[in-house]
A protein has these predicted regions:
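Active-site phosphate-binding strand-loop segment of PLP-dependent enzymes
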Residues: 2-86
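PLP-dependent aminotransferase class I/II
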Residues: 13, 88-221
Length: 221
């Protein structure tokens, strides 16, 4: 596909899933730009945030949520022309719920206190708050300060190496009825997820566990 099927579009939104095959996605987006020079192209770079060449001149706006990469309560990296003023209003109910979930998860993992159900329930409650409220909110002071010390290179290296371990053991996955979507990683790709296809729901539940993946058919690196 080269974008020829897009007609009279004032605005085009593109995104790459999982952070894999990003070079193919970029080629597709460049073809769209060539075919639609006057359209506004917005790129959601959340999944490909740490991959190569995410922020070039093909796009008018690029945004990427840092929540999925960092575990912080909020925050977005934005490249735009002209500049967009950052939002300052905070959703305090959301911030409170996320921090309760973080504390409950930490106590469960570190001290064995509480339950997995409690912190998962709190995280789900926080996500529902965002889904039900389309208004935009700014990053909290605490999250902004923490992100200043967030080691992007370390995270990128860990994601890449962990995903490669999963890819290198694909024969074991197939024995369990799980087919990796990407058998090989491109040089510039830093994956957010390691996507897989399950032969059946039973294979998913037995191979990963009902709560072992963030979503059906996905396993985290």
């Amino acid at each position: 596909c080269n974008g020829d099927g897009i007609n009279n579009a004032d605005m085009i939104l593109t995104l790459n899933y999982f952070g894999i095959d990003t070079s193919y996605t970029r080629k597709f987006e460049q073809e769209i730009r060539a075919a639609h020079p006057d359209s506004v192209i917005i790129k959601d770079a959340t999944h490909s945030l740490l991959s190569d060449d995410v922020y070039d001149d093909t796009y008018d706006y690029v945004f990427a949520s840092i929540r999925k990469w960092s575990g912080l309560s909020g925050g977005v990296i934005l490249k735009s022309s002209p500049d967009i003023e950052p939002l300052t209003r905070l959703n305090m109910d959301y911030e409170k719920t996320v921090h309760e979930a973080m504390s409950a998860k930490k106590e469960y993992i570190r001290d064995g206190k509480g339950s997995k159900e409690r912190f998962l329930s709190l995280y789900n409650k926080a996500e529902e708050m965002l889904d039900s409220d389309p208004a935009g909110y700014g990053i909290s002071k605490n999250a902004k300060e923490q992100f200043r010390y967030f080691d992007l290179d370390r995270v990128a290296g860990s994601r890449k190496s962990n995903c490669q371990i999963l890819a290198d053991n694909q024969d074991i996955w197939r024995m369990k009825g799980i087919e990796p979507v990407c058998a090989d990683l491109s040089e510039g790709d830093i994956p957010l997820f390691f996507p897989v296809i399950f032969r059946s729901k039973d294979h998913r539940d037995k191979g990963v566990g009902k709560e072992g993946a963030e979503g059906a058919g996905q396993a985290l690196p």
